[in-house]
Each structure stands twice: as structure tokens, then as C-alpha cells.
């Protein structure tokens, strides 16, 4: 059917075939047009008009608004291909050539308003060889390049969920073979699936791509020897970025093995249950631990805080180094204030370095880099005479080559830089000998025009004669139509207007040629100088990134000190013991949401040789869930190197945190609440260790009472008596039968949420005390929830019958015919 299409539509079809599953935006003059199904998608998602020509649906967007519209499409998960008109087509005849020069996908963003300021934006490739899975992920905006390998899908899925990529890349066979894996990932992540050619995932192709990218002949120096699935994924990802998306890869860091440094492991379910990054309900981010802890001043510090929150340290040295730094800045309030102000002037050094390395930087970006580097020198000056803790020692000794770069940027650039190179006025006059000369000629042209205008007014006697400039005409002389006959013959008519005539002269034309030539020369010179400056900056990229890491580390510990000062956090003792002792501990999020002084603190004492499991009973709304979550959050904060909301704490390092909390169950996954509960509990039983912390909130609710009780007790016994699984466990339950375990096992201790009664009405004290709860007060909670009073009254009657000698309540007479 192609022969029936116009030449332009044939060209569109060729581009569309190249674009694949991308939405194609096709440049036509001052618009980008979409056709057929793409036009429908464009119109529906951008709220623009859908039209048609010769029965072909079409819609379009102005070229000047391209970036904003593309961002909106990508934010909704679409991949977009841009087909541009070829350059230098003036005077050419026939159809203008068009080629795809950009493909934009959610995970492959170099520079975009969609990039989260304080989070990574990963595209992740995945590959399988036999029973092994290899993954590789890139954050193109900062050059981070990671690889990893797993021998089971559970660890694979957990790793991908922690990285939280926005785009997943593989080949058709992998997607077909691993539908269950992809389905699980889509349940946890908002992710765009991309497909690439299978041969790119083969070892020979992948290694060749890696060799070329990093200019090496072996990958052993990267520590990748033997990691065939990971190497395959890494090579395919580089090929996809460079060959398919047409993006640069020269700025990427060498691949690092993800997860090589051991961390406190927090699985995706626990991240969600503990509301680490976002709340289960409510506004995005608000009410999360991240939102409470976020006091960073730089994008790099913010990304470091976020990544450390979901990957706290397991190495005691790493924890102690950061604690020492937090303590140092906590005691230095004036210095902390100065540093916070200076850190707030440092922009995203990592992403600025990437933009410059990939030739995407504007003069304004260079100015931002200059100002940020200058702020770093001010930070270094303020730290110079301080007895810094070990964590920050020598991190702000700025290398001489970087000092030279900072000096160049500070002295050789104009203070207010333009957005585009073509606007000029980037460099100081003394930066290049031709700059001042050309600028003087350009500047003197203004006075020449005024002098010329005055001279020909005197020569012609026409006092209202004007010398003007228009983009289309250039310089011209304008007089009223009735005065035009008075002009000498050497005046050449250019244009007639309603009441005016426009002329030029040989002298004016010669002047214009000289001025235009100067402007062209000036723009060419500044463009050349700008490119040279960018190359000079790229030579210092490693030093800039090293300084960026130092800024992130400083921002991290200063922000934690600021948090500790604001809420009177205390330094926990963290060591290799198996202690978990917290005095007057408080939930860090709830503490910020309540009026000052109203949150009730509670103690916790657990030790493997003594209490290894706390069975917590008490009515709903009495604070049980808040308390057990609180313990997990305080452990996480402590292993981040942070101070915590407690009077004191002694925390033995934890290797894993597991939670089973029903509030976040997602029934859209196709599993019942009970099945979700059992699956999460099974994960805990299989993977907990003696150094783990387990939080269980109501096990066995979704089945019969005796089934549920049996499951709950079996879980308790497993965690108490199975070698290698004796994790510290906080178990909130309504099964009062479980509390009898305290009499038979020395490692179990009963606690309950205290409730006082006043005229039969419960008063929740929010205190956790020894012993088990006597009443559940469930009917009272139902009343508070708005149950009809008749239902509340009937429930009370049934409860009394249950508590009496006859444990089977009789139905009300009015209901007997209905029930039987």
C-alpha cells in the first residue's frame, strides 16, 4: 500500500518503523505532528484537538512547546521518538529529509523536569542464563552503572524493588518465560517495559560493547569475571542506550557490583508496611519516615539519605563514623547554620557534570556549576580549621587542578549568563583577544547609526527621516511618502508602506554587511570558546564527582544533626551484641504529627539470653501497632548512623527486618488478605536469622478462630525454638491463649497496651506495660466507628452470653425465622 501514499507519508512510515513501540512526533514546519493511532494517543493524553486529513487521524503540538508535552507523555509511561527535519535545507527542492534523532523513555532521561531531584532514575536490563539472573541498571543523569547476579527470583525481585527503576529492558523470550516475575514487579513498581533484540544479550555482543565503551580488553579489572548473565545485561543495556535511543554513554562510571557491601536488608513488604518512603494512605511522602528525616540541602545529599534509608548499614564502622559526625555537628550549632546556608547554594553537581559531558549544557548550566563550586570552596574554608571527625577528614581538600578550574570559571565568565550560546555575552572581554575588538565594533555600530541618521537629515533637509532595523529588511531609511521625492537618486527603494517609503544606500548596505559579519564572527567565536570550556570542564569531571560525594556526605550528617537538634534525639549505642534496649522510645513520625509533649514514650528490653519475643495484647486503637512499628523504625535510624527519639538505647546490629502488618494489603494482586498474610509470614519463616528483627501484627485473622490460633502459635514456636531462626520478635495479637506461652518459655514475655476504665468506658493510656490484656474493648471501638446503637446494644448482649456459662448465644426471636 506504500505506493499510494504521498512522499511525506512514505517518509513518516519509514520513521514509524524505526520508532517501533514509541509514539512518533514528526516535524512539519513549526509543529510536531502525530498520525493514525499515535494521533489518538496524543490527543487523549495532552487534551489537544484531533483532526483528520484524507481519512488519516492527526494531531500536533507547537515546536516551541515540545519539551513540556514530551515530559507529560513520558510521565504517563509512553516512549517518544522525535523525527526532525534535516539541517541546511534552505534552497533545496523536493521533500525535506527527516530522521529520528531522539528517543525519550521513562528510564533514559539525561536532562528533564521529570528527573526526581532527590532520587535516582534507573533504567534496568535483566537477563537469564540457565538458573542465574543478571541485572544491570543505569542512572544516565548522573552516570551510575550497577550490575548484579542472583540465583533465585525472590532475591532478584527484592533487588529490583529496592532499585525501583522506571523502565525495564529485556528481550521477548525472557518476557515470555518469566511472566510471573514481571507480574510481581508490576505489582510493586510503576514501570515501563521495553523490548530489545535478543542478540544484544549474548555474551560476545555484550562484552564487545563493554570493551568499546570503557576502552578495555578485559572485564576482570571491574571484578566482573564469571558474572555472565550480569555482563550480558550490561552490554545489552549500553547497546540499547547508545544504538537504539541514540544517547551518549561516554560519561558513565565503570560498572560496580550492586549489594557487594552488606546492608541491613528490608524487603519491599516491610518498606511499605513501615512507610519508609511513602505512607500507605494519604498524600505522597507526607507521613513517611523519609519526610520526617528529610533535612538535606542538596540533591546529592537527598539521594544519599533516601538510598541509606532503605539500605541502612550493617558494618559497625560505617555506623559509628556517621554517629561521630552527627554528634560533632550537633554540638556546633553556629557552624551547622553556616554550612546549611552554604550547602543550599550547591546545585546538582552530578547531573551538571553529566550535562556538560554529554554536550547538553547551556551557558546558564556552566554558571550554576561555577556558583556551586564557589560555594564548595566557602564550605571548605569553614571546615579548614575544625577538628573534623574521621568520616569527613580530608574530604574538602580541593585538588589544585579543580582550584584552577574554579578560578577560570569565576574570573573569565560574565556573571549573568544566557540560556543559549547563540545569545552571546558568555565570556569576559579579556578571555580572548578578538572578543573585545569584535564587541567594540558591534557596540560602536549604534553610535554610527545615530551619526549617519543625523548626517543624512542635514543633507536632505528631512528632519523626520529615521534609520531603523527590521529582521526581514535589515537596516533601512524611512521617510513619509510625500517626502520621498526629495531624496537623492542614490537612495534605493526597498519597500513601500501606506504612509511611508523605505530606502537604503550603498553606504548603509556596506555598514550592514560589516555589522552582520561581526555578529556572525562573534557568535562563531563564542560558540567555539564555549565548546572548549566544556571540554576543559570534562577533563575535571572525576574531581567534580569526588567533591560531589563529599558534599553529599557532609549534607547527610549535617541534616541528621539538624533533625536531632530539632527533636532532641539521642545517640544510641550500636554494637555487635544481641541487645535491644530502648528507654523512653518514641515513634519518629507520630512524634511530629502530635502536639509537643503529647506522645507517650515507651520502653523496650529484649535480649537473646532473656526475652527474645514480646507478645503484645490490648484493644484496637490503644497503640500496639504504633509501638511495634516504632521499634523497627528506631533500629533502622540507628543503623543509618542517625540519632533517635529516645532517652537512651542499646541496639545490637540487626541483619534483616521483616514485618507482617495487614494495613497495607493490596487485594488487587489477586490474592485474598489471608493468602497475602500467609505468603508474607512464610517469607519471614524461611529467611529470618538469629540477628533479625521480626514485627508481626495479627497473624491468622482471615480464617476460623482455631485455625488462626493454631497457625499463630506454630509461628511463635518456630521463631522461638528453631536454630538459626531465633529472631527478636514483637507479636501483636488478640489471641489471649498465646499469652500462656510465657509460663512455659523463659524467652517469651507478655506486654499489653494499658487501658483504664471510667464508668465502663475505656481510656487509652498508650503505655506498654508488663502482663496481658484482660479485655479487648472491640465493641467500644465499633461504637466510636459509628455503628448503629441497636447493633452495639445487641453485640453487648451476645458478649455477655459468651462470657457466661452458655457459650452459644441464642438469636433474637425476631430473627429466628431468618436465621434458621
UniProtKB/Swiss-Prot annotation:
One of its GO terms (cellular component) is cytosol. The keyword DNA repair applies. One of its GO terms (biological process) is mismatch repair. Gene3D superfamilies: 1.10.1420.10, DNA repair protein MutS, domain I (3.40.1170.10), MutS, connector domain (3.30.420.110), P-loop containing nucleotide triphosphate hydrolases (3.40.50.300). Keywords: ATP-binding, DNA damage, DNA repair, DNA-binding, Nucleotide-binding. One of its GO terms (molecular function) is damaged DNA binding. PROSITE patterns: DNA_MISMATCH_REPAIR_2. Induction: In infected human monocytes transcripts are present by day 1 post-infection and last for the 7 days of the experiment. In patients with confirmed synovial Chlamydia infections, 5/8 had transcripts. In infected human Hep-2 cells, transcripts are visible from 11-48 hours post-infection. ATP binds at residues 618-625. Belongs to the DNA mismatch repair MutS family. This protein is involved in the repair of mismatches in DNA. It is possible that it carries out the mismatch recognition step. This protein has a weak ATPase activity. This is DNA mismatch repair protein MutS.
